[in-house]
Amino acid sequence: MGSLVTPNEIINPSKQDLTIRSESVKKGLIPYWDRDEVNYLIDRVANHEHQMLLRFLWMSGVRVTEAVSLRKQDIDLQNAVMRVRWLKSRKYQERVVPIHPRLVDLLRLYTATLKAEDRVFPITRQRAWQITKKHLGGKTHKLRHSFAVNWLRSGCDLTPLHRILGHSKIQTTMEYTKIVPVDQGKELIKVVF
């Protein structure tokens, strides 16, 4: 089997984790995994529920607390969107997040037997963190970072990413451009004068 990582990024079999890229640590960048690394790590998870939770976090970019509070009725598979709620300053906030077509298919199968009011992942956030620690070395938010980096590497715009991640300030989302610089010249070509 070919290696997906360099020797500096070798897999630690005891922790089932990839180390943070040395160049991102040196530069003080946000730690992340690239697409192949994340998929490799998640594909190795034998427990179907654990694998689905990790894949959902990776493919949606939502926070753990948002994922574990999600109910089947919050997901609109027909229109490939979900309503995500989170608590901020003692008030619930809500945003609509698009769902990738591949994740729509996975959710359709995974939620088929659930009632509308059932939680998709009926666990606590602490249990979700334990699952992440077991399979990824405890780096739950690194899946969210990986989603954002993958989004930008795919050539998608920063503004929708800002909305999907639910950041209150665009400056927070712009931290990802230190890893994947946004080509503003390419964006200018899209503008019609």
Indicate residue ranges for each PLM-predicted region.
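Basic, Lys/Arg- and aromatic-enriched nucleic-acid-binding interface segment
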Residues: 31-64
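Catalytic-site neighborhood detector that most strongly recognizes the C-terminal catalytic loop/helix
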Residues: 88, 165, 169-190
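N-terminal DNA-binding recognition helix of tyrosine site-specific recombinases/integrases
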Residues: 1-23, 59-65, 131
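Short alpha-helical segment immediately N-terminal to, or the first helix within
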Residues: 44, 56-57, 70, 150-154, ...
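Active-site-proximal segment of tyrosine recombinases
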Residues: 66-67, 138, 148, 155-169, ...
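DNA breakage-rejoining catalytic core of tyrosine-based enzymes
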Residues: 19-39, 90-101, 115-121
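Conserved tyrosine-mediated DNA breakage-rejoining catalytic core shared by Y-recombinases
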Residues: 69-105
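Active-site/catalytic core of tyrosine-dependent DNA strand-transfer enzymes
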Residues: 100-141, 147
